[in-house]
């Protein structure tokens, strides 16, 4: 299945939570989800009781859309999470957080993950001084993520950095240098996401 190209705000309403897909608009009263926080469509306001399977599937879809990953990418990450030591659900969240497009967003270089994905794909981002244009690239502790020298004059990036956003504890930002550093691996308490990851594990365990 290809990437979704329809109205992004409908995805937030479908999943019942803000996915922060439209940047600054998501933080204002203009956000459609803030005004209509129910599912789209004729029967969107009706309360439907989900089956256990339906709840598991909903959590998976929610997580996929939050990070903007496709089904096959998600499956590969889940398989890797299973092979890692520790709790599979938390491992999965850690891998998703470590994606370069997510880190570019978390550091504030981009206003949304889709925008961050575009910055990476268009070659505006470096990791340890080398251009990386793969959004799914996984960062590790010690990595330095920076905006390329020739891209630092972009109004988009400068405006994004002027907005005050919380940078998670596992990352460190130097606004003046247009760079951030991965201090440690992200832990579950660093990920402020209302996801019941154990439901996703149950789904894949069937």
From Swiss-Prot:
GO cellular component: small ribosomal subunit
Residue ranges occupied by any S4 RNA-binding domain in the UniProt entry: 98-158
Protein keywords: Ribonucleoprotein, Ribosomal protein, RNA-binding, rRNA-binding
PROSITE patterns linked: RIBOSOMAL_S4, S4
Coiled coil, from the record: none
Alphabetical list of CDD domains matching this protein: S4
Any Gene Ontology biological process: ribosomal small subunit biogenesis
Protein name: Small ribosomal subunit protein uS4
Family indicated by similarity: Belongs to the universal ribosomal protein uS4 family.
Role, per record: One of the primary rRNA binding proteins, it binds directly to 16S rRNA where it nucleates assembly of the body of the 30S subunit. With S5 and S12 plays an important role in translational accuracy.
The protein's assembly and partners: Part of the 30S ribosomal subunit. Contacts protein S5. The interaction surface between S4 and S5 is involved in control of translational fidelity.
GO function terms (MF aspect): rRNA binding; structural constituent of ribosome
InterPro entries xref list: Ribosomal_uS4 (IPR022801), Ribosomal_uS4_bac-type (IPR005709), Ribosomal_uS4_CS (IPR018079), Ribosomal_uS4_N (IPR001912), S4_RNA-bd (IPR002942), S4_RNA-bd_sf (IPR036986)
